[in-house]
Design a protein with these regions (language model features):
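Mixed-charge interfacial surface used for oligomerization/domain docking
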Residues: 3, 9-26, 31-32, 85-88, ...
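A glycine-rich beta-strand to alpha-helix segment
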Residues: 80, 109-110
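Class I S-adenosyl-L-methionine
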Residues: 32-101
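Generic macromolecular interface patches on structured domains
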Residues: 55, 102-105, 150, 154
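Acidic side chains
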Residues: 7, 11, 36-37, 74, ...
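A structural signal for short coil/turn segments at secondary-structure junctions
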Residues: 73-74, 103, 218, 246
Length: 276
């Protein structure tokens, strides 16, 4: 039996056609720990963070969390957030090594996406598609890794406070964002780090710039997955603009869960897309 597992930054709680499990990450702020599972109220999380003046941060899934997720199956595909900005992939690999000591017959492959959110969703959907074709485990791994090279990520943020506080971007870069409606448009680099590409003022200019960046990155009407942190209007406007260029494009919008809401902050929009 095949099982697909991803950390909670994929923003998925289920996936049609496969056995899927999300392994939660944790957001810590002051005296509160917010476990990023299906019970988390992301609106409450964002409100709490907006009122919180102290330090905050995130924690990757525990070794035990991964080990429990591995149980009950013999073929496992694991999808993680970029290893360049998180210890999640390393914790999954450590758990795999422990699990295989007592379950040597189980096959476990870990995909370090060098990305997050919607690009992880695209990979999950591709794995489900390949599994439905009845392909062998090793072939699925190979084809999925090839597919990952054809997907990309852009995002627009109204604030870089939490990213800067946790060392993901420089505090100098974060300082100018959010002032007078300035948004930052960025991408996931080939190394899985955050690469700013443009500053925009206002939602309309940000949307137009995002569409232009996708087109420049050779987007030709493939799948698009848009995740947002309480900004359905911007997500919808982006989808409508892309449909204006490619009316038949498969575009899906969903809200961010806890981890992506923490780093994208309220108003952030994250876009994963295919260029194949």
């Amino acid at each position: 039996m095949m099982k697909l597992i991803a950390d909670s930054s994929a923003n998925l709680t289920m996936l049609e056609g496969v056995t899927y499990q999300s392994v939660p990450m944790t957001i810590r702020a002051g005296e509160r720990d917010f476990v990023d599972d299906e019970t988390l109220d992301t609106h409450e999380l964002l409100d709490y963070l907006a009122a919180h003046n102290g330090k905050s941060g995130t924690a990757c899934p525990s070794l035990d969390g991964w080990l429990k997720a591995f149980e009950g199956t013999d073929e496992i595909f694991v999808i993680t957030i970029t290893s360049s900005l998180s210890g999640t992939c390393a914790s999954a690999m450590a758990a795999r090594d422990v699990y295989l000591q007592s379950h040597p017959e189980v096959k476990i492959h870990i995909f370090d996406t060098l990305s997050t959110g919607p690009e992880m969703q695209l990979l999950a959907e591709k794995l489900a598609e390949l599994h439905a074709k009845g392909l062998p485990f090793d072939v699925i791994c190979e084809k999925a890794q090839e597919y990952l090279a054809t997907t990309h990520l852009f995002f627009s943020l109204k604030s870089l406070h939490n990213l800067a506080q946790n060392g993901r971007v420089s505090k100098i870069a974060a300082g100018a964002i959010g002032i007078l409606g300035i948004h930052i448009l960025a991408t996931a680099s080939l190394e899985g780090t955050i690469q700013p590409v443009e500053k925009c003022r206002g939602e309309k200019k940000t949307c137009a710039a995002m569409v232009q960046k996708l087109l420049e990155a050779d987007y030709h009407g493939g799948k698009v997955r848009i995740h947002h942190a309480e900004n359905p209007e911007a997500a919808g406007a982006l989808a409508a603009s892309l449909h204006g260029h490619f009316p038949e494009a498969d575009i899906e919008i969903r809200p961010c869960r806890g981890l992506c809401s923490y780093y994208a902050e309220r108003g952030g929009v994250i876009v994963g897309f295919e260029t194949m």
